[in-house]
């Protein structure tokens, strides 16, 4: 698949799986909602219930920015299966203003954020490599 098609498929997914590296080298993977703008992905710590706003994924990124994100499409007709992976480097923006382009992109994408925009830390991933697969049978 061409890069534009990989981006299009990735952006069409409502959720991605974010994989980061724990300080001890073990992988850590969680589902996230996100907005994609070009080769930059944004995901915020929002008001959904959590034990803490200082999440493991944020601690991992602060220690090691390497990450990968995966979206996929599955259905019983295996001729329609596909997946897209985005490999990149992440950073944490601790207190982004409401005008931050990432916050604005999330507000545009998710109705839930229109009444209560995310106010917690913002994860910003610069995608360095797109890869994917689609069934051809």
Where are these regions (language model features)?
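Short, surface-exposed beta-edge/turn micro-motifs
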Residues: 13-15, 64-67, 119-120
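Charged, gly/pro-rich active-site loop segments
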Residues: 1, 74-137
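Short beta-strand segments
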Residues: 14-50, 69-72, 82
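Amphipathic alpha-helical interface surfaces
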Residues: 6, 53-60, 99-106
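Short, basic/aromatic recognition patches
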Residues: 1-17
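Compact nucleic-acid interaction/catalytic patches
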Residues: 44-45, 51-67
């Amino acid at each position: 698949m061409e890069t534009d098609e990989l981006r299009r498929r990735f952006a069409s997914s409502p959720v991605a799986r974010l994989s980061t590296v724990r300080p001890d080298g073990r992988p850590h993977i969680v589902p996230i909602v996100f907005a994609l703008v070009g080769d930059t992905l944004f995901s915020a710590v929002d008001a959904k219930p959590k034990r803490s706003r200082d999440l493991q994924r944020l601690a991992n990124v602060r220690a090691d920015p390497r990450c990968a994100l995966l979206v996929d499409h599955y259905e019983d007709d295996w001729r329609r299966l596909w997946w897209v992976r985005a490999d990149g480097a992440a950073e944490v923006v601790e207190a982004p203003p409401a005008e931050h382009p990432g916050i604005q992109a999330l507000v545009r994408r998710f109705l839930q954020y229109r009444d209560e925009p995310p106010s917690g830390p913002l994860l910003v991933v610069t995608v360095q490599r797109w890869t994917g697969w689609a069934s051809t049978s």
